[in-house]
Amino acid sequence: MARYVIPYFEGVNESAGELAGNAAAARLARNVTTDYGRLASAAGASPYIEAPAPGGAQSLYVFCETDADGERTEYVVAGTDSAVCVFRDGQWKTLYTGTAGDWGFLSYKKEDDSILIFGNGVDPVQCWDGASETATALAGAPAKGKYFALHYERVWMCGDAENPDRLYYSRMLDPNDWTGDVVTPEMGGGFVDLPTFDGGVITNLYSVGGDLCILKSTTALLLYGTSPENYQVTRMSGELGTIAGRTAAVYGQTGYFVTAHGIGVQSGTTIVLLDDRKLPRLFDATFCEEENCAEGLSPHFGGCAAGICFRERLYFALPLGQETVNSIVLEYDLARETYVLHDEIAVRGFARSGLMRERLLALGADGKVYALGTENTAGAQWTTPWIDFGTSEEKVLRAFALYGRLESPGRRPCVRVTVESERGKKVRYLEALGPREKLYKRRFRLGGRRFRVDISAVSGTRFCFTGGLELETE
């Protein structure tokens, strides 16, 4: 007898092909976590607001208001296909009804006053003070807009359907005045035109590292400077943009967003693709042999994909195949450089909530708002690549062993382990035996030249395998 040990577990990595270069790197990792090399069920989602947002909810935002006494009130806001609603007094209330969707939001605070600014690029920009029953037009707004950012004490805005290449900025400390100032131009407002002459339009903007990044569908620009008299715009090297501007997320001094070929990374004046190629099934159309591969990123992702950064991880809600709505969430751990997928709920948008932004919320396709990272667990799966144990000769597997704990209602068989070769497969079940760690060893006999192992858990199961995976061969 010989033993083959996979000492720890990782996320998805198909960069080395289907045959194991690293057996710990999964072919598929769904609704699991591999933190610290352990394989565990991922925390799931539970309803945060059970009442569905009305009218085809598309986006989510959390607006916080703090009064003069320091009392903080948090409002969950949803953008629908034609309106913006807020949840308060136990129900959804309409703040504004427009003629289109795709809303953008920005919180602005001046002294003791907080306002929510929002727009869709078609209707007049609106603002809400957190107390009124409805929103009102933002006084002084020079145009329509749907992408907003705060940068050097000014509100920046773009996305006007009539001027798609124009970037507007307000006066310092005054979102209600966007006019220029002849006497002291450094205090005035104005606009900057950003044509690229290749058909690209602005898809989002964000402040990062003291500069302003403007994403376009075909490229990206960086605006730097502290006042109108020294603003300069440079085109970033890399020739990379995105049609999915809502996926933009910032961590530290770096911006991230989803493109058709992978995750874009913006650092300073350079934009590149995240150089790991671990997800060709999702981002490389030539990887799948089938036509219209259902596992690849949908070409329609620009109209629905969303992203956020939360606790050193990026979360991207994405559509697959030919879908026009999101069906999976891609999680990328920035510290460990690992990917896992989640499909418990179809997510339309994300938002952070709580005093320290410690809670991650998601807007589901059903219009409900969910809290992510709860005790609920979805069905989970982790699959190895093909393993040939270093030789193409015939081999026989005799057993596998996992060390850890399982918990499931009713102590029914809750984890299924499938060992497969080109000759067939063997299936064994593991029962929940309480919260204590235990050795789970199952015997079988299966011959072949190469093998792979699939570990699957039913919904509601909590598991954590801490000692890797051991295979016995002869």
Locations of regions flagged by a protein language model:
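Beta-propeller and closely related beta-pinwheel folds
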Residues: 45-56, 96-103, 135-302
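Acidic/polar residues in short coil/turn loops that connect beta-strands
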Residues: 89, 120-123, 129-132, 188, ...
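A short, charged
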Residues: 113-117, 122-126, 152-156, 160, ...
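Hydrophobic or amphipathic alpha-helical targeting/insertion segments
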Residues: 106-138
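Short coil/turn linkers that define WD40 beta-propeller blade boundaries
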Residues: 92, 133, 228-229, 337
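Beta-sheet repeat architectures centered on beta-propellers
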Residues: 1-96, 100-111, 239-254, 261, ...
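Short beta-strand segments and strand-loop junctions that repeat across beta-rich extracellular domains
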Residues: 83-88, 125-129, 165-186, 222, ...
